[in-house]
Amino acid sequence: MNRNVIRLITRGCLILAAILLTGVATSCAHRLYARMQPDGWSAQPIVNACRFTQDADLDSATGTPVGDEGYYLYILTEAAKWDFSDAKSILISIWMHPYGHSWIILESPDDRMEFGQTGNIGKKKPRYHEGAMKRLDDEHPNPIAYLWETMPDGKLQIGKPDRPPTFVWRMPITRLKYQLIYEHVMNRKYDEFDLRTNNCTDMAAEVAALASVNLIHRIRLTLPPETEVWFLRQRIWKDTKYRILEFSTPEVLEVDLRQLAQFGIGSDYTEWYLTLTR
């Protein structure tokens, strides 16, 4: 199968993934998309233009990733079930389930290592949802601006986190890609955690890109200037630079990984992992 045919197949997969992410064909994905509403709210997953990078190691017949025997990359997600259907729903769902997580496993014939990016633990600064809610209470003109803050408490997670994933995806990689990813993980800076540009899902997506797969993992929110919070009308922003918020989230990443597994790009290893950790 030549590269043009593979490109057409992967482009079709991306289009189908975009349809599924906007809620036409899955029961859970509708929470990730909301068309522009009268109050100014909208939510839209950000879809990549190309699924594989130029140096991807693909099977010539199927167009799916291949690797060396015993070398694998796993991406794990813990989706917090955030509801992006409207401004009120997202605020309530974040308050009820403020944390999600994404992390990785690197496997070779001799070893299996688990890594992730952590932060936003609330010791040096209030956590994102706490800081934003505090600014709402204080009638700050731009309470949502707290989500633009950088947390100084980031660190490298080594080993299993203290909560199980909701999905585990595995893909084969070459020994060369394994070494490239390992060096990236070991040399990456973790001391800062940023919701918009440097969170746990960003780290997982970076690693996937080194394995030559571009994952759909970001969402774009258009925020209304005001919304109802706890039965009170509250200002969200006054300065228009806070109208658009883009960030990576396990919810979007997990939907994409599930679709990839259905397309035959990688595999669902959730049960394997949960059995392994019992």
Indicate residue ranges for each PLM-predicted region.
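A structural motif
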Residues: 152-183
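Activation targets extended, charge/polar-rich intrinsically disordered C-terminal tails
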Residues: 29-61, 179-278
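Second-shell loop/turn segments in exported
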Residues: 90-93, 163-171, 186-195
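Glycine-rich catalytic cores of cysteine/serine-nucleophile enzymes that process amide/ester linkages
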Residues: 33-163
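Bacterial N-terminal signal peptides that target proteins for export
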Residues: 2-14
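Hydrophobic membrane-insertion alpha-helices, especially the h-region
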Residues: 17-22
